[in-house]
Amino acid sequence: MKKLFVVLVVMPLIYGDKFPTSVVSNCTDQCASYVANVFTILPGGFIPSDFSFNNWFLLTNSSTLVNGKLVTKQPLLVNCLWPVPSFEEVASTFCFEGADFDQCNGAVLNNTVDVIRFNLNFTTNVQSGKGATVFSLNTTGGVTLEISCYNDTVSDSSFSSYGEIPFGVTNGPRYCYVLYNGTALKYLGTLPPSVKEIAISKWGHFYINGYNFFSTFPIDCISFNLTTGDSDVFWTIAYTSYTEALVQVENTAITNVTYCNSYVNNIKCSQLTANLNNGFYPVSSSEVGSVNKSVVLLPSFLTHTIVNITIGLGMKRSGYGQPIASTLSNITLPMQDNNNDVYCVRSDQFSVYVHSTCKSVLWDNVFKRNCTDVLDATAVIKTGTCPFSFDKLNNYLTFNKFCLSLSPVGANCKFDVAARTRTNDQVVRSLYVIYEEGDSIVGVPSDNSGLHDLSVLHLDSCTDYNIYGRTGVGIIRQTNRTILSGLYYTSLSGDLLGFTNVSDGVIYSVTPCDVSAQAAIIDGTIVGAITSINSELLGLTHWTTTPNFYYYSIYNYTNDKTRGTPIGSNDVDCEPVITYSNIGVCKNGALVFINVTHSDGDVQPISTGNVTIPTNFTISVQVEYIQVYTTPVSIDCSRYVCNGNPRCNKLLTQYVSACQTIEQALAMGARLENMEVDSMLFVSENALKLASVEAFNSSETLDPIYKEWPNIGGFWLEGLKYILPSDNSKRKYRSAIEDLLFSKVVTSGLGTVDEDYKRCTGGYDIADLVCAQYYNGIMVLPGVANADKMTMYTASLAGGITLGALGGGAVAIPFAVAVQARLNYVALQTDVLNKNQQILASAFNQAIGNITQSFGKVNDAIHQTSRGLTTVAKALAKVQDVVNTQGQALRHLTVQLQNNFQAISSSISDIYNRLDELSADAQVDRLITGRLTALNAFVSQTLTRQAEVRASRQLAKDKVNECVRSQSQRFGFCGNGTHLFSLANAAPNGMIFFHTVLLPTAYETVTAWSGICALDVDRTFGLVVKDVQLTLFRNLDDKFYLTPRTMYQPRVATSSDFVQIEGCDVLFVNTTVSDLPSIIPDYIDINQTVQDILENFRPNWTVPELTLDVFNATYLNLTGEIDDLEFRSEKLHNTTVELAILIDNINNTVVNLEWLNRIETYVKWPWYVWLLIGLVVIFCIPLLLFCCCSTGCCGCIGCLGSCCHSIFSRRQFENYEPIEKVHVH
């Protein structure tokens, strides 16, 4: 092998003092420019961060990125870097295996070389003298392919002429071909205007300026003739390996590289930035911790079948010598039922294998020769129209039916059978498939027949599961439940909830899980991490606990505290650098809590010129709802789009900063929302106690004046003293003994006749007639007469009758007068009763009419109240809609996961399980595009909603400060009226204000004066009202009065109410018609203006129609409902006024009766009654004493009788035994 002509000298250290820098010997005065193109390899094969990457391009197999950042796998891990000043004009060979790394500049790696990069390092338009005559690629198949370019189109006979690949700027187009033995196999295209880098991969890819010009079989070595020309150009040859890195591209060239090789660099790669600002950043789930894999299958006795497919290829040459696969190639299936055209799998398992043969022909179609050289080909089966790849059939794909056929009759899909040559793939036949989806047949990589239960379970931990064909990530837990049927159980949305293990009959629950963490980065270093699990991560070993998460940090919590001590007891004194809500992280990694300070804004009164001042009011309570906050949402974009699939994550990086923009928008919105809400709201302990029923009922939380509030009636029944009479000094009532000793007669009396009569008689019956009373001019006496009065008048009547003949009839006059007076009393009582009856009948009828009308109004009021409650229900429904808006948006976002966006499946893992990698990438790209669109719509809706809520929150804060904490002077700000006070209460996602206001019902119009212009001896001065809230006016009595503008309360103005100003001059501002639009601008329709502009510049542009299922923002608007409630409240108020009038009418129907007094008269018993009572007492008392004291065995009579009986009785009685009861049967 020819060696490179390289002369190296050791120069002073450029990139540190660890590795010397090798510079070519002929770098005279241009050494500085050479140093910019040569770097010292850092340990690990990394390129220094300050390297300029002059003429280093991003290798791509598709479109070229012009500008941007992306995370990709590129050959940027340098195993060896050779600075080369010039080449010999003989062929030089470079091999991927066994390369000599003795002349490397800097560190040397022994990794596998993937790509050899040839860089021509120059910054100006340098033109090479000759360049490479030809690039020879020695493939692993023993075939040598040559790549060369020509300055014009050539024929077959011209390929032997001179060709080259010039480096630097080329003159005119150069047409390039792939040659084999001097014969063109493929036309590659034209060279770019300036060739600056050639990179060749061991996998057979040939790149020029980063673009893949040609691909072939794997390559062992590269050989080419090269000269540097007349200019002083400089070469570097880099032996590189693929590694994952964040690459910044400008004008298609690499300008900066960040290796994704460390924890902090991985975060830089995920955020697509080389410099991280101080803050919190999400950590990849792979760095948080890995999960085990669980598989649950049905145990069964398995049988296995091997399906061998033999494909015989026929190859021949074209007119240009290129290989062509014949359509006469044949496919042979295993024999089944004497038929080779269709083969169906009849076992539980199967494995498919392809065997390929190749025959060639020169001129005819009889393929007998072996395929050699360029005609050598291998049969491959490509995906075709089937939703699964042929090479994935043995990867545990399941079917209910699976058949292979050579005929399209009855087929569901087909595979393409192709001949793979050294240059391309050519489809020759089709292999048709008849299948049914199911679980009866499974393709396996090897024979696994027999009785098996291949289930593997990892319980009580986050695991990646495949349960009866349903995949996901969750926690599997054993339960004690018993369900009679079913293998697995899902929710209505299709999520797996649990399953039954048929081997032991145990039911397991499945709970979705996702381990997440946030890294705290300060000055580009990870100082801490917030995580949901207690596990070391990101190289952090010290940790502490909080009520909501674990915190790992570089701060050593174990110095003075116990490891894992709660954060509240650590008392770290430091200044936080980054904050989130009420927590912060210091530069040393310590976690601290932040004290939130509150500040109130200044409130300025508003001056008004209204001279119509209210004189009467009605009180109204008006309700206002204001939304204060929304629930923050954080979405892991890569998890939502790819669900952790590594291949999908690689594809997702091609979308540059899509995920970063989505996550940062939501994160910043959530942080701003959290900070503003936290600074606005705080918890009051007293209010929290009053919110509890137990604490509210406790007298400890109430004002001391209520602690000793007496019970009703005082202690026990002490209050009855206010109900029962306590003074009887005037003897208005008789005692209980008097009620017993006298007969009480109750009658009805006229007015005060009876009381005046009693007071006149003084209890003497003889004064009965003398004390006669007069009622309406008629003489009357009480109708009840006692025995003495009856005796007296009887004697008068008897005396008159007896002495009548003798002229003594006048004695009966008192009797006649008394009888007539008592008859008058009875007659007048009857007349009063008749009048009262008429009054009662008329009043009752009128009352019934008023009551009927009143209840009719009450009925209408109740109806209005019912409709008012319906309006309140609608308002509450809107509040509920505000609460559910975000949930509905998230639900819509989740539903999008079930949409396949025209892919064959919505499951990424299922797509890669069924298709080959290239076809699966195309299908997954559709899912990524659709899901990113759904995420963008959701983020737009969320940000719009947050902006609306942010303005609403500021309004709520202003209303709390002005309406609740003070009394607002602004008319209409705290309710529609003059504000009295307001109460605020919590509501879903916001606050409800109850504004108590005065609504004017009558007004007084006055002529207001802005001030008084006064005249002194030698000067004129002005006086204006000191309090601008007062209105100055002059009344008819020529006195000045002041009244508040909110209520008409005039008072005489005094000198203390005024302040003096300089003069009385008034400045008038005159405006013309031309100046008026600048003062009062015309209404401008912004939408129409924008539409006109767009139509002028883009006449064919149309407004896109965004359906609500993509973007749906809900705005809270309770104005209509509140106005409706106020209208109904006003109507109810008017109804109550009418009811008050009707009640007054009912009150006017109160019957003012002439009461017949209830007269109680006590009549004394006659003398003979008292005599009879005395005789009974005299007789009964001695008899009772005798009976009690003398009788009985202990009495006097009893003792005397016993003595006499014992003395005079001679008969002695014998003692007898007591008689017992005898039963006779």
From Swiss-Prot:
TM annotation in the entry: 1167-1186
Ranges facing Virion surface side: 13-1166
Region (Fusion peptide), start-end ranges: 798-819
Chief location bin: virion
Region (Heptad repeat 1 (HR1)): 813-932
UniProt KW keywords: Coiled coil, Glycoprotein, Host membrane, Host-virus interaction, Membrane, Signal, Transmembrane, Transmembrane helix, Viral attachment to host cell, Viral envelope protein, Virion, Virulence, Virus entry into host cell
Position of the signal peptide: 1-12
Source taxon at top rank: Viruses
Region (S1) residue spans: 13-552, 17-552
Ranges of the Intravirion topological domain: 1187-1225
Recorded family membership: Belongs to the alphacoronaviruses spike protein family.
This protein's domain notes: The KxHxx motif seems to function as an ER retrieval signal.
Name of the featured protein: Spike glycoprotein
Organism: Porcine respiratory coronavirus (strain RM4)
Organism ancestry: Viruses, Riboviria, Orthornavirae, Pisuviricota, Pisoniviricetes
Gene responsible for this protein: S
